[in-house]
């Protein structure tokens, strides 16, 4: 599990270094046994240690004494429960993706890389407050037959 925690940290730091998310925004998780490992709430990625990565069960249970998961843990849980093939989730707040998502429309197949999302477009999940079941439902709908979506 230590190696997987280190991988979560490595890619979390890349959110910042690759300018995909600023400071503490975004979150990353990786499926692990009967749950997943996820970045903690409000943590500065450059300072993360293995012990900071939080384990959340697929039932949504976690030990608060060991850390508080990202406020977006619920949609990670729902994706892992509904998409058995999902092994990891990256939720970034890039300037471009954020700008596009504010229009509430997906990305059409203007480039062959769109197909990497699993379809002929990238869907945009309908807006809902962060951390809610409603947001999870909207994300799952946007992910039908897809590997990626805008939020």
What are these model-predicted stretches?
Residues 1-151:
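Glycine-rich flexible loops
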């Amino acid at each position: 599990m230590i190696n997987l925690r280190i991988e979560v940290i490595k890619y979390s730091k890349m959110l910042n270094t690759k300018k995909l998310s600023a400071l503490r925004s975004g979150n990353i998780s990786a499926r692990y046994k009967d749950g997943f490992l996820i970045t903690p709430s409000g943590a500065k990625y450059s300072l993360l240690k293995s012990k900071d990565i939080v384990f959340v069960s697929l039932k949504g249970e976690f030990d608060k004494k060991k850390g508080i998961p990202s406020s977006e843990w619920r949609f990670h849980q729902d994706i892992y429960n509904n998409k058995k093939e999902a092994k990891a989730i990256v939720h970034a707040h890039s300037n471009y993706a954020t700008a596009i998502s504010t229009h509430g429309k997906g990305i059409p197949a203007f480039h062959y890389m769109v197909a990497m999302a699993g379809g002929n477009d990238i869907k945009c999940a309908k807006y809902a407050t962060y951390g809610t079941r409603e947001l999870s439902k909207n994300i799952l709908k946007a992910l039908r037959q897809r590997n990626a979506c805008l939020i």
